């Protein structure tokens, strides 16, 4: 019986691993707003983040979404907004010893072959538990631009000045930091709170932009912001990916019989005034990550119903699913959800990845979640999904591929391809290994041994009698892959 169970486990593992796609977004959110870094010194926070990144890489994660602006503040050096209290414990106080978490995280992610997406909360200016704002905070300097709501401060989306300010903050990030993506989450107009009313009747009556319905007017305010942010990114660094992670329900069918889902919950369109599908259809965003945090069988918002709805409706841009690790483990649904993802992933489907909420739960291996990722579901590395709507070219081939003995052992070296412009330049390389005589199929991710920013790879030399074929390709900023270069090597 024990042998039979072991055999079945090996078969399941083999089938699951072989079904992995070569291209898949495997992200994880690292948030600061939960206070996990407060009270840490520079060295402890760097050590904590290094450990998290190492564990996430082992789990197969290839992109980190790092929160850098939770309440019109900054986890990076900014001339526009104060240092975040979620970094130092007091808003406006610089870290000591001094460091720049965003700059540091970019370097740490890139050297591990991972992308770094800077995550901002665009309109939230104060969280409920923030008692003191720095003197240079926008709510202190320009209080007329924000409104209070259920203990929060919100930058009023009705003001063009606010939309312009957020775009200026983003442009500053893009100009000074080598980020791969710019990410915003589900906070637009505030989540409805009992007894609270959004105080924007004056703005609506004085500047309604031709709208007679205040809900349509609010949606238009957010739409204008999304379009302006898209245009800002395109103007500054067109290769940077713009992603949005909305609440998991667009509209319920009872509100919209044609485009609503068979759900009964809060709605992006009606309650947060966020018309996600419009942004996807217009091409204003580059990827969409709905937060489908419920379990399969949830009566108000069934996971399977929602993942199928988003796959059917979010068709003009890559779709990644926001996954709640703790809830998935609680209901014992990791295998079932993964099988559902696998059945929907593919070249003809908008579903092209997953983002884990939240990174620390994977690092802590809640319910064995991380173990299953690294050993079964994400056993092999994955490249990022293609985005031909941003750029469809590819880098040239690597040059002068050659194994050389060094003081560090046997090392495979190559030179970067020549490039005509920055967007086509190689920024990472993929190294594949095949046994001698084996078919060279670089679409099979089981042959990937490294995704690296370096122009070398340390070879696992044994006795010099085993023959292998190594293949090296180059990736540009959008993970377009070059033609392959082969090298026969004895190890």
Q: Model regions: which residues?
A:
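Beta-strand-rich modules
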Residues: 459-481
């Amino acid at each position: 019986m024990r042998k039979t169970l072991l055999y079945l486990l090996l078969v399941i593992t083999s089938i699951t691993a072989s079904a992995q796609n070569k291209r898949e977004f495997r992200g994880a959110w690292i948030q600061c707003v939960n206070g996990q870094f407060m009270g840490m010194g520079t060295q402890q926070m760097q050590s904590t983040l290094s450990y998290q990144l190492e564990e996430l890489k082992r789990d197969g994660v290839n992109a980190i979404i790092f929160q850098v602006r939770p309440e019109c503040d900054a986890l990076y050096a900014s001339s526009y907004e104060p240092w975040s209290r979620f970094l130092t414990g007091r808003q406006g106080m610089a870290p000591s010893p001094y460091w720049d978490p965003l700059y540091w995280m970019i370097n740490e992610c890139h050297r591990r072959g991972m992308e770094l997406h800077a995550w901002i909360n665009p309109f939230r200016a104060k969280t409920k538990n923030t008692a003191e704002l720095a003197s240079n905070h926008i709510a202190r300097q320009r209080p007329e631009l924000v409104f209070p709501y259920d203990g929060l401060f919100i930058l009023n989306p009705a003001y063009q000045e606010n939309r312009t300010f957020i775009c200026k903050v983003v442009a500053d990030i893009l100009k000074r930091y080598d980020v791969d993506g710019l990410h915003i989450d589900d906070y637009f107009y505030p989540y409805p709170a009992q007894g609270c009313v959004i105080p924007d009747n004056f703005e609506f009556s004085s500047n309604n932009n031709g709208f007679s319905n205040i809900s349509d007017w609010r949606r238009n305010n957010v739409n204008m912001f999304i379009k302006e942010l898209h245009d800002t990114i395109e103007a500054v660094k067109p290769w940077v990916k713009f992603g949005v992670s909305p609440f998991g329900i667009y509209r319920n069918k009872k509100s919209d019989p044609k485009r609503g889902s068979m759900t009964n919950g809060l709605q992006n369109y009606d309650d947060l005034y966020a018309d996600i599908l419009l942004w996807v259809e217009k091409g204003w965003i580059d990827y969409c990550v709905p937060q489908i945090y419920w379990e399969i069988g949830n009566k108000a918002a069934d996971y399977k119903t929602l993942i199928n709805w988003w796959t059917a409706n979010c068709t003009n841009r890559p779709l990644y699913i926001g996954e709640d690790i703790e809830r998935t483990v609680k209901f014992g649904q990791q295998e079932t959800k993964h099988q559902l993802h696998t059945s929907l992933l593919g070249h003809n489907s908008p579903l092209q990845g997953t983002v884990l909420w939240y990174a620390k739960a994977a690092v802590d291996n809640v319910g064995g979640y991380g173990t299953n990722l690294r050993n079964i579901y994400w056993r092999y590395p994955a490249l990022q999904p293609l985005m031909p709507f941003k750029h469809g070219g590819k880098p040239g081939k690597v040059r002068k591929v050659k194994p050389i003995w060094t003081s560090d052992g046997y090392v495979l070296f190559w030179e970067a391809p020549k490039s005509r412009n920055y967007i086509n330049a190689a920024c990472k390389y993929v190294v594949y290994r095949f046994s001698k005589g084996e078919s060279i199929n670089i679409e099979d991710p089981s042959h990937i041994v490294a995704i690296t920013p370096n122009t070398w790879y340390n070879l696992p030399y044994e006795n010099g009698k085993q023959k292998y074929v190594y293949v090296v390709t180059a990736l540009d900023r959008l993970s377009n892959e070059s033609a392959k270069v082969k090298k026969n090597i004895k190890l």
